[in-house]
């Protein structure tokens, strides 16, 4: 069983205290091609491309131009699971997971990324900003199409080493479309979270994002390897709701 989640635009590069066996990014040649493309963009072009403020565009320009795709170590990079710090990662709280759980996560959790493609928890990453939905073409393909074959092939390889061949999709649509479901030789399972608002159940973005992190943590900490045990998730008031679920979707409500 492998969980896939989205990355986060917010990143924290404060050093971590615990020593791990860090790993290098999977798709180094593709990263070189992408970062070299991004380095050609001036500040004003980044502002338009990414639809961000001039100040933020300057920061992104600086990040990309200081990016060294031939060197990933503690001087310029940090393990991905401790670097991303958006809502999903606030729910995950990776810095409070024990060493054994982080090591387990290395083989059971993957992050999708516009720049890195697929990222394992202990892969070292440098500061960047490139959302999968960015309107940029590489080799004549939009970004998620550029990554699709590469990511799907790598996932199939990882699943060949897994006993339970289930992909738990906790990524947003923007990122999960970078996986070719038809070419993925495993079961695909989506998970959704809904809130009861005045008697009607609705998916509310900020709550759903944090819940994705909470259930990721739950699966990792409990070493869950089957769907029936995922249904037992009952953190932060969420309960499995069969009325909104089917064989390809687990929905939790509160």
UniProtKB/Swiss-Prot annotation:
GO terms for cellular component: cytosol. It comes from the Bacteria. One of its GO terms (biological process) is response to hydroperoxide. It holds the Pfam family H2O2_YaaD. PANTHER family: PEROXIDE STRESS RESISTANCE PROTEIN YAAA (PTHR30283:SF4), PEROXIDE STRESS RESPONSE PROTEIN YAAA (PTHR30283). NCBIfam families: PRK02101.1-3. Belongs to the UPF0246 family. This is UPF0246 protein FTM_0239. It comes from Francisella tularensis subsp. mediasiatica (strain FSC147).
């Amino acid at each position: 069983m492998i969980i896939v989640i989205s990355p986060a635009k917010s990143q924290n590069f404060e050093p971590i205290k615990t020593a791990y066996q860090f790993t290098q990014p999977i798709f180094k040649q593709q990263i070189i091609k992408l970062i070299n493309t991004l380095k050609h963009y001036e500040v004003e072009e980044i502002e338009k491309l990414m639809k961000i403020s001039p100040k933020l565009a300057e920061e992104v320009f600086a990040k990309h131009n200081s990016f060294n795709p031939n060197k990933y170590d503690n001087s310029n990079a940090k393990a991905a699971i401790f670097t991303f710090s958006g809502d999903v990662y606030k729910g995950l709280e990776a810095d409070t997971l024990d060493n054994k759980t982080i090591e387990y996560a290395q083989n059971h959790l993957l992050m999708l990324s516009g720049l890195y493609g697929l990222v394992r928890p202990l892969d070292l990453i440098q500061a960047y900003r490139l959302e999968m939905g960015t309107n940029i073409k590489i080799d004549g393909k939009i970004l998620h199409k550029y990554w699709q074959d590469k990511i799907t092939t790598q996932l199939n390889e990882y699943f060949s080493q897994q006993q339970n061949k289930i992909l738990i999709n906790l990524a947003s649509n923007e990122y999960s479309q970078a996986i070719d479901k038809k070419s993925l030789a495993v079961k695909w399972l989506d998970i959704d979270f809904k809130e009861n608002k005045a008697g009607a159940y609705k998916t509310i973005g900020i709550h759903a994002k944090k819940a994705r992190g909470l259930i990721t943590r739950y699966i990792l900490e409990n070493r869950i390897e089957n769907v029936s045990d995922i249904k037992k998730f009952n953190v932060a008031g969420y309960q499995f709701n069969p009325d909104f679920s089917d064989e390809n979707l687990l929905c939790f409500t509160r």
